[in-house]
Amino acid sequence: MENIIARRYAKAIASRADINDFYQNLCILNSAFVLPKFKNIIESNEIKKERKMEFLDSFFDIKNSSFQNFLRLLIENSRLEYIPQIVKELERQKAFKENIFVGIVYSKEKLSQENLKDLEVKLNKKFDANIKLNNKISQDDSVKIELEELGYELSFSMKALQNKLNEYILKII
């Protein structure tokens, strides 16, 4: 449910001309969500909505009336806690709009930057898009490339290769 709500807000922001200003301001607020005190203030029903607006305004040197109206809307609808999801969804929509996609390479060992760049170049050609890959360490012996936004997943497992090789040898015998 919260993803649907965040998606609607992000879609509305993505259609604006000042999307980058909104995105930067939301990122500032999003970084504050790691602080428990900030979350307590945002989620508190005891703090008046006007005080919450003043508190959030204090994060910004330059006031943007459109962004302030957006914050008021979130406050009025008690949806400030959706800001992290809105930021995440907005990042996804911006990337889609700019034809940039982020993928994850799962491997047992950390891949070198050179290997990641090589994979990026090959995937860029395959999908005719700008692919950025991050490396995450996993426990299994397989290598897995996941591009969630494009619905692409490729995995190579030594165990699976070994099993297929054994089957092939048994068929020959």
Curated annotation (Swiss-Prot):
- Report the subcellular localization: Cell inner membrane
Top-rank taxon of the source lineage equals Bacteria
Main localization of the protein?
Answer: membrane
Question: Per its record, what are the GO molecular function terms?
Answer: proton-transporting ATP synthase activity, rotational mechanism
Q: What task does this protein carry out?
A: F(1)F(0) ATP synthase produces ATP from ADP in the presence of a proton or sodium gradient. F-type ATPases consist of two structural domains, F(1) containing the extramembraneous catalytic core and F(0) containing the membrane proton channel, linked together by a central stalk and a peripheral stalk. During catalysis, ATP synthesis in the catalytic domain of F(1) is coupled via a rotary mechanism of the central stalk subunits to proton translocation. This protein is part of the stalk that links CF(0) to CF(1). It either transmits conformational changes from CF(0) to CF(1) or is implicated in proton conduction.
Give the UniProt family note: Belongs to the ATPase delta chain family.
The protein's name is ATP synthase subunit delta
